[in-house]
Amino acid sequence: MSLQEVRRQRNLSQRECAERSGVNVRILQFYEQGIRDINGAKLVTLLKLCNALDCGLGEILTDEETLKELEIYIRK
């Protein structure tokens, strides 16, 4: 699944998602359009998005290796 798919499932506009998460709407658009790789996002940004969308990291990250590394880091 992608960030955009999760956001749409929650019936949120980009602006609403940005406001809920505190992530700049332009940055959110860049992640959704692939201009910026969400797998390289700061952990704090990922967590803000997950909290706003009520989802897990695995639902918005597209790279399995990145997800595994983050899960290991968070468990420490």
Spans of model-derived segments:
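DNA major-groove recognition helix of helix-turn-helix/homeodomain DNA-binding modules
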Residues: L43-E59
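Short alpha-helical DNA-recognition segment
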Residues: L12-Y31
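Short, charged recognition helix plus adjacent turn
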Residues: G58-K76
